[in-house]
């Protein structure tokens, strides 16, 4: 998991430099991450696409098993409970937005 997260951050920074130049800034990194399209870290993770509307990248995972020498996929990439997750995200976001306008 740590390697996967680092690879996403590294690729986002690489794209930020390629598209926005040096030095890196928070806005350039955000733009770099939001330009990830079907990035899979050479098969380490499910292909992700990050947009301004969806920073989750797709939310897919798979079950793997160690065979004594390597990790072997036991399932295809799956996105479990996405309907439930997005329902809660939208509800909580609406509640937060409402509370902010009442301040």
Segments and roles (model prediction):
Residues 1-103:
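Extracytosolic ligand-binding ectodomains
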């Amino acid at each position: 998991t740590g390697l996967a997260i680092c690879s996403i951050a590294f690729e986002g920074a690489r794209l930020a430099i390629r598209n926005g130049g040096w030095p890196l800034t928070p806005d350039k990194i955000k733009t770099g991450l939001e330009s990830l399209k079907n990035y899979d870290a050479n098969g380490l993770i499910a292909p992700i696409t990050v947009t301004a509307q969806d920073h989750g990248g797709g939310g897919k995972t798979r079950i793997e098993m160690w065979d004594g020498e390597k990790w072997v996929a036991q399932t295809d990439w799956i996105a479990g409970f996405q309907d439930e997750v997005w329902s809660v995200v939208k509800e909580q976001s609406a509640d937060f937005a409402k509370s902010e306008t009442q301040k």
